[in-house]
Each structure stands twice: as structure tokens, then as C-alpha cells.
């Protein structure tokens, strides 16, 4: 099995609450404990050869299985209201895409769907209510939350760039995002009409 954690491995909505809450001693101790046991039982120690880095700043991993590259994105360790992945994780991700995925298919694991409904109007309304924090984790967890939309586009464009690179091999390859979290099954497609490329998503 290959595993990646999400908020429920820590507590519901981790990373999508105000920073002063996330930084308090109670929350930080919960996070450190969850991180310790995630390393032991899911990552199975930092000796795991698939990790993109061994410095514990994030747990994104990559491996090859038959004609698929499997790239697991860590969307929790560095998450805040303002980012999904930190700069060092982006650097490791870009390096792996540039140096390793030159042909074959790509399966990207993203705990929260990249292709999903736009809740920005609802999010704007909730921001002005007294129960903002109770609903924050459900709305701000999404890639399409207003604070994450730029990073979402960065991920999509980066995947399309990799598709163009793989075209050089003259092989018919696919890029598929495998996701979950939203309690509903779905299929989605992101189209690049200019270059006739597609990214499929399965939830």
C-alpha cells in the first residue's frame, strides 16, 4: 500500500484554521503526536526510499509501478489558510517532474479534489458570520478556496507542462489525479485547448 495523511489523521480541518489557533501549544502537540505516528504506521520511517525529502518538512513521495509514475502530494504538513504546499515542497515536486517523469503515465494523489465545485460565494458569506470557524475547515480545505486558487492553477499548469515534455517520447500517456475527501464519487477533466491536452480526475 501507499499512504498519505490528511486532516483526519491529525484532526478535522488541520491547516485551515486561523494561524494563531494552529500555533497554540495544544494544537502543536496534537500535530507533533499525529506526525510521529503517521511516520511510524503509514510512512514506515524516514528510511522510506520513496520520500522526496528526508528532512521531515513534508512527506510527498514518488514511485514507479509498471508504466505509471505515482506521485503522492502531502497537502497537510505545510498547510495553512494561505498555502497548501510550502516552497521547499514545490521545489522537490518540480525537480521530480523535470528529472524523472519523461515518459509513461502519471498518477497524482491529492487528498482533496483539484476539480470540484466553486464555493467562493458561500465562503465569502461565511467569512462574515459568527460561526465562521465551525465551517472554515469544509470550505477553506478545498483547492478552490479563494486563498488557494493561485496555487491550484500553479499545480495544473505544472502538470500540463509535464504532459508537453512527455509528448517528446511520442507515446500516448495519461495524467490522472486520484482524490477523495468529499464523500461522493465523480469524474472530472481539465482541458488545455491550446495544446490539446487533458488531465483526468477520479474521486
Report residues per predicted region.
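Metal-dependent phosphoester/phosphodiester hydrolase catalytic core
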Residues: 1-203
